């Protein structure tokens, strides 16, 4: 009888040890997955921060571009106003993304606003072709060089950001990470894409 009791207690202890071990493994796994998701999400946020720096630089340059053109393009008021309006809308959309880089709707809205801005800049570039004195202006040449350099940096930062988004979303959607992501509200991140396919390339503001 005594031996049976000892055997029963030993079996129960073994079961508890096994269950405890399984629980410990699960806890460690959850912590590891959670930390990995946090690291990838922070990478997305950092990637956006790099884009944001370049976008702000470009938004600051566009008024200089418009101001440099004003003196020559007296009959292109509507074109210049369209650039200013599109710039202001894109800047507001970028500010919304900065508040929450993983907000997919905000990122998509920025993509639309950027498409409109690049379209407006493209129209301005076409209009400038009729003003050779403007094209040769030292002030305009300086602004165009700075703007082109900034556009290239935006494109580079956007690619790095999108790569981070893909890594984060892949981890978030993979099993068993998807379970942890759902438990702790890791929302899907959106890639930063310009909506209008016609203006996805870096806008060219050089004049020859």
Q: What function would you assign to each model-found segment?
A:
Residues 2-208:
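A helix-centric hydrophobic-segment signal that preferentially recognizes long
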């Amino acid at each position: 009888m005594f031996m049976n009791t000892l055997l029963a207690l030993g079996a129960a202890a073994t079961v508890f040890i096994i269950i405890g071990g399984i629980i410990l493994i699960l806890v460690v796994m959850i912590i590891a997955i959670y930390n990995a998701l946090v690291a990838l999400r922070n990478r997305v946020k950092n990637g956006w921060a790099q884009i944001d720096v370049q976008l702000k630089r470009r938004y600051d340059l566009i008024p200089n571009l418009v101001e440099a053109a004003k003196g020559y393009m007296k009959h292109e008021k509507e074109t210049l106003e369209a650039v200013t309006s599109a710039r202001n809308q894109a800047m507001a959309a970028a500010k919304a993304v900065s508040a929450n880089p993983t907000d997919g709707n905000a990122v998509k809205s920025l993509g639309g606003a950027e498409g409109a801005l690049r379209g407006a800049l493209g129209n301005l570039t076409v209009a400038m072709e009729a003003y050779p004195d403007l094209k040769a202006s030292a002030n305009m040449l300086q602004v165009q060089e700075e703007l082109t350099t900034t556009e290239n940096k935006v494109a580079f930062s956007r690619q790095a950001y999108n790569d981070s988004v893909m890594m984060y979303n892949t981890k978030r959607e993979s099993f068993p990470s998807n379970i942890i992501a759902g438990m702790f509200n890791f929302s899907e991140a959106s890639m930063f894409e310009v909506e209008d396919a016609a203006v996805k390339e870096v806008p060219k503001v050089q004049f020859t």
